[in-house]
């Protein structure tokens, strides 16, 4: 069901309850959370915290549209890669307690720069194939984010989806991240076109520039072709959360997120 949502990220001065109340006050009706919001990996409570968080958001009229897994499938040691896959399985199980079936996922981060770039694809492909085996069991779907440097290419994302071959693997379409990576706007529009049928979740984000020249702004104030992204995704039948992500200078008090909500309310 379509909703205007927001990510629990870049809300300085708000704890989780404060975020929930402020976001609801602005008008948001769904949110994406981080795995740490609902689960303490070192003290696994079998989903009890996740259920409490779900009740918190229910109480302010919001649902949880997705949870970010915080996974990293680019690992120098095989044992660490296997541990990440095992952890991902548990994350999928825990996330179901929030009421969503969307696991917003990264590819990998190559922390420490220990893995050659030529090995990244194989590691991520094998990992997502392994994960595909238990998605049906937990009735969840993977929304692969175009995030960082390992997954920020729409042609590659589509290739991964096709090679994994699971209808439960799609994308979290971040409208800005491709530009941050360095793609030009025409190429980004191409990514919107080819990935639209595979969109499970969104990050509606705007800004200008790439890498060290990147500046985040409220929706509608940057250079991203947001209306074209909406057109492509809607045409493909997407009916999920339109989730605002704001990285501009007006984070205090949720001011930037107020502006994003106003744009989304007028355009989606």
State the predicted function of each range.
Residues 253-268:
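C-terminal helical cap(s) of enzyme catalytic domains, especially alpha/beta-barrels
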Residues 3, 22, 30-31, 67, ...:
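Acidic/histidine-rich catalytic cores of soluble enzymes
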Residues 19-36, 99:
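Catalytic domains of carbohydrate-active enzymes, especially glycoside hydrolases
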Residues 28-44, 68-71:
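N-terminal substrate-binding region of glycoside hydrolase catalytic domains
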Residues 17-18, 51, 55-63, 74-170, ...:
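Active-site acidic/histidine proton-transfer and metal-coordination neighborhood
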Residues 23, 31, 57, 95, ...:
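Conserved, mostly hydrophobic/aromatic
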Residues 28, 95, 100, 199, ...:
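A structural motif
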């Amino acid at each position: 069901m379509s909703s205007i949502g927001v990510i629990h990220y870049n809300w300085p001065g708000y704890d989780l309850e404060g975020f929930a109340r402020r976001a609801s006050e602005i008008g948001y009706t769904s949110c994406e959370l981080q795995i740490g919001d609902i689960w303490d990996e070192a003290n696994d409570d079998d989903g009890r915290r996740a259920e409490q968080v779900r009740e918190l958001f229910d109480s302010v009229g919001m649902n949880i549209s997705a949870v970010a897994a915080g996974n990293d499938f680019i690992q120098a040691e095989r044992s660490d890669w296997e541990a990440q896959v095992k952890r991902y399985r548990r994350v999928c199980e825990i996330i179901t307690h929030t009421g969503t079936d969307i696991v917003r996922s990264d590819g990998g981060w190559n922390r420490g720069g220990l893995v050659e770039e030529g090995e990244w694809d194989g590691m991520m492909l094998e990992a997502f194939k392994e994960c595909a085996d238990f998605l049906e069991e937990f009735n969840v779907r993977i929304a692969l984010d175009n995030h960082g440097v390992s997954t920020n290419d729409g042609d590659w994302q589509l290739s991964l989806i096709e090679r994994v071959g699971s209808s439960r693997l799609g994308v979290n379409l971040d409208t800005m991240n491709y530009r941050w990576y360095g793609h030009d706007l025409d190429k980004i529009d191409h990514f919107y076109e080819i990935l639209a049928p595979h969109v499970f979740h969104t990050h509606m984000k705007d800004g200008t520039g790439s890498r060290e020249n990147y500046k985040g702004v409220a929706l509608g104030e940057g250079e991203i072709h947001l209306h074209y992204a909406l057109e492509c995704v809607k045409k493909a039948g997407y009916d999920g959360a339109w989730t605002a992500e704001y990285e501009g200078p007006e984070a205090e008090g949720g001011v930037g997120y107020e502006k994003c909500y106003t744009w989304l309310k007028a355009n989606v």
